Structures are given as C-alpha cells and as structure tokens.
Amino acid sequence: YAPAADAAKVVDGLGTRWETLKIAVKPYPSCRYSHAAIDGIRDLGHAQAISPEEVKEVMVGLPEPGWKIIGDPEPAKQSPASVVDGQFSMAFCAAVALRTGGLAWDDYARHLGDRDTLALCKRIRTRIDPKAQADFPAEMSASVCITTARGEFETYVRVPKGEPANFLTASELRAKFDGLVGPYLPRERADALARGLLALDKARDIGAVLRLASPEVRSAEPRLAAGFRLARGRQANSTR
C-alpha cells in the first residue's frame, strides 16, 4: 500500500534473496491464529496421555487480535454451525485436536454435527494472553492449560508448526498433500504429482506436471483424506 511504485524493489536481491523461503505452510485447515494452540494440545495430549473424556476445561491464551477472531464471542465460538464457523472457532479446533490428535479437512464433516465434539467445545475457554500479546506480531503464539482430574497440564507454543523457524518435516508436508489431493486423485497419480512437484526445478515440461493435477471423475462415495495427524505413541516434533 505504498503511495507510489518503487521499480528498484522489483530486482532488489534478485537471484540472491528468495522470498518464498519466508512463507509459512499451514498444517491445519483453520485460521492461523488457532495453530499454536492446536500444536500445544497435540503435544500435551501425547506427553500426558490425555483422553477427551477426562478433560474438565481447556484454557487457550491468544494475542488480542487472534482472540477477537477465534475466541470472541465465546457462546458463538462454542457452537459452530458451518465449516467457516469451525475454521474460526478456537473451541472447535481445540475439541477436534483433543479427540483426534490434529485437525484435517474431513474433520469438519465428521465433527460439526457430532454431539461429543460439540459438548467438548463448551469446555474450551479463551482469553487474551499477555505473553502471546508481547510476542505478536512477530509470532502467532498461544498458551494452553488443560485441566483434568489428574491435575493441570500447561504449555506455551511461541512458533507454530509450519513457520520457517519450525517448518514441516518432509513426512508432515506429504501428509498435508495427501489429505488435500486424496479425494480427487488416485494414489498412483498423487504419487507421480508429488514426485513431479518435488523435482520441479529439473522438469523439462511443466505442462506434464500440471496435467497430473487434473482431477478424475470419481464415484459419488467420497474418499476420506489422510490429513495431518499425530499418531498416538509417536514422538511429537516440536521446536519452541
């Protein structure tokens, strides 16, 4: 939104500075403000073997701009009625993460009408966290406190997964890819497309790679996407 164009910036750092390396990749199909909290819930759930049934309350602390978008007003955020509602509801994202160990695109269809998930949403609270506010806007951080009969379990995630400083592993990136293309491409074509994209710098015919991305006409029965999951018992990857 500069008042005038600056032609010099078009070639500034050309060939030496790669802006794409500064781009984050969202592991979850929800508002980015929710991601640090989802990471924290995944980490605590794995480390403490927390089951959704034992959760009395989850308190998520957010920077104020994020809280206004995904935490307020609390009654509405605890009762999402559509996919967009769910994407911008910290309560819904947290409830799904508690129940599944993550959040994938198919979870909206599975959980928006699920009574147990919606009941769990009522136990998710949000607040403005001073520490997260101090880290903002450099980071979109979050604090998480899960209260159970066994006690309280807390964590603070400063850099959410997917940021350049905490990027997805190769397997996590592939899991996101599979979750998105799974309903539209057969496995063999998805594998070929993934190989083509990863070797794009060596491609002689970019059109051949793009043609692999054309969806086929599939049967009416949807295929569930793999999504981005934290398998129970697998070591969680985190750099905080």
Where are these regions (language model features)?
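Terminal-appendage/accessory-domain detector
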Residues: 1-240
